[in-house]
Amino acid sequence: MPKLSLAKLERHLYSAADRLRQEGLDAATYKDYIFGMLFLKRCSDVFDAEREKIVGAKVEQGMVKEKAETEYGENPDFYDGFFVPERARWIYLQDKLGDAREPYGSVLDKALGALAEHNDTLEHVLDHISFMRVQSNKRIVSDDACKDLVRHFSRYRLRNEDFQFSDLLGSAYEFLIKMFAESAGKKGGDIYTPRDVIRLMVRILKPMPGQSVNDPTCGSGGMLIISREFVEQSGGDPTNLRLCGQVNDASAWAICKLNMLLHGVPGADVRLEDTLLHPMHREAGELERFDRVIANPPFSQNYTKSNMEFPERFRWGWAPTTGKKGDLMFAQHMLAVCKPGGMVTTVMPHGVLFRGGAEKEIRKKFLEQDLIEAIIGLPPNLFYGAGIPACILVMRPNLTGQLPNPNKPENRRGQILFINADAEFHAGRAQNYLRPEHVEKIVSTYDRFEDIPNYARRVALAEISSPANDSNLNIRRYVDNSPPPEPHDVRAHLLGGVPVAEVEAQRSLFEALGFDATHAFAARSDAPSPPETGERDGVRGNAYFDFAPSLTDPSAIRPLVENDPGVQARVQALRDALAGWWSAHASRLADLPQHRKLNRVRSEFLDSFSGALSPLVVLDRFKLAGVIATWWTDTLPDFKTLLENGFPGVIDGWVDAIADAVDDDEAAGPTFDPFAHKLVRRVMSDYLDQIAAAKTDVARLKGEKEAFEQSNEPDDADEEELKIWNYAKDLERQIRELKAENKDALKELAKAEKVAAGNPSSKRKPHPLAGGGKGEGGMPAIRQSILAARARPNCSARSFACALREN
């Protein structure tokens, strides 16, 4: 049985959500039903596997199967995971699909209730899910929809051995949470922090095995999950990391608990209560302290002191209880529950950096005790439902009050690193995103604790506290990344020409690409010579250029650059350097299944790639690091598969992904083009070229067909014209038939590639559709027909159609 890939499972879940959208439900409503159904199916499938193992062991020992099933298979004491009672098992739910004696929604509710009743870990976790809920005298989810969901989730088994990598189900659950957050707007922001922001924060904290991580406003639990993921990918034991969270919303708490369970972290300690009023993690009556504290608290909220426990947490001051200025109260709580030598990272709105009043006094005390290590300005509109600018505070506690803060690394004491990253992001349709290259630059700058012009600067506390700055932490005050004004040459605007000064300003870019700018410009003969101009680029006394005579159209610029000898030489040097780097370091991937230290290999790739290509000065070190960071993120599911199934498992996954994309009817969700897959490009390049050429011909034929139809009416057409009326559609039909044949070709060729990968001496016979074959009716035949017809002199749409039919 092919293993489930993350992309396939995501499409499967997306289709399930589509079915509930047909009921008129929004994301805030239907998410609970998808979560509940997914959890039921997962628990049942895992239980079945464990039950088979328990019963099978007893049968091997000589026990009658029926007795083994009764005495051991139905005994909760023999199960390490969840015990699933009969009415919560998937086979029972399937059997009930045709039973009309009871509403099917009630069957599902009883299944959830029975599952929770038999497993203490699930106490109150599933209470909010009810398939019988009524709104405005109508069931929210109809019985038909409930049954469709069960049939839909019956398509795939969800045991660990069915997944390409063990954490696949947890990753799919994260996909669901993100999908719901995107649809829910501001409400989505309450439970979901973009994972690129979380990974940035976790990479700054660098949690290690044996430590404890706390998120006092944990939402769906993403910060805890990714902290665990970081430890695992660093080669550490993730089970030796204590995860604790607290959230003040019952629905978010349930989502978080399910997230932990589906990621295989049943021991995560997640509490339901208001963190500022009643912090729940305690030891011997005192607040528990943690090695790493990470959070994205709700922005700009009021709070109350009424019945507040442990008020000594706020020894740096009290923010106003009204006016939506409770942000620094969360920051103080995080410092109060952080161990000596620990670290804090928290997202904050920019207002906490510069507002006056009580917040300013808290800020002053933070500075006086040297608590802040770095302030990172983030791009706007990163967070769901919050368009206001945000930043990340990196802090270390100072319980002794000694100055400078002894918990900071020695070279960071008495100063703050300001990083202004608000201009570097990917602009999406509804919100902005941090790409891996942006995260890599921020983390690298923080780790090096270095100054970078217009991006980062270390500032002494004395400068910040001076009368001129008055404890104002506004990032732009210390790192202004405003772009320089665009130069405007009035004379060039009026009389034409390209100022030589503007060309000179881009000289470093031209040189990096190996391009000689004089090939694109020529001396402007009608321009007077300013006295100060002198000789520049062989054009004496001329302050303006014209474009070269060969550049008569903007479309000519690209070929001029691409065909420039210097550019071609630089491109070849880049290719050679890349090939040399890959040849020297690709073998590191082969060692991954042994040591499992993904982060170490990633770091080695980043450093070695930059070292190999930076001498070419085409890209700076941050751009080079971004290339590897982006590639690594895109390839991470394959790396996870490699760790657990080796290279054959990776190639199996590629084959299955290609086949799924061709065959899968769940196409509404996240998809990819199978013809763009790396494996298809490698083994079927000729065929892909022919497909592209045929598509070009189809587009041209459509245009000719439309012109033909506009000048000829069907009623007036003779028999000959009627025969060729739909010639373009005939060709499109042939293309569709070819693609249908290609389903098998994709699978056969990919499997042949897998065999060849395992046996270098194997000989592959090319598939007829891949070019060079003798199959009939394939792309070569169509392509030859097109070429033969188009080669005829005076080929009109009508004569071309006739010729095509003859061929």
Enumerate the predicted regions with their spans.
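Non-catalytic, mostly N-terminal accessory regions of nucleic-acid modification and defense proteins
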Residues: 1-205, 209, 271-280, 377-380, ...
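Conserved S-adenosyl-L-methionine
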Residues: 187-295, 300-309, 314-318, 328-329, ...
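Polynucleotide-recognition surfaces of large bacterial nucleic-acid defense/processing enzymes
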Residues: 290-291, 398-488
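Short glycine-dipeptide loop
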Residues: 338-344
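Short glycine/serine/proline-enriched coil/turn segments at secondary-structure junctions
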Residues: 354-355, 382-386
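Short hydrophobic/aromatic beta-strand or adjacent loop that forms the aromatic wall/cage
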Residues: 388-392, 476
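Low-complexity, intrinsically disordered segments with a bias for serine/threonine
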Residues: 529, 533, 765-766
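Glycine-biased, low-complexity coil/linker segments
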Residues: 534-536, 771-776
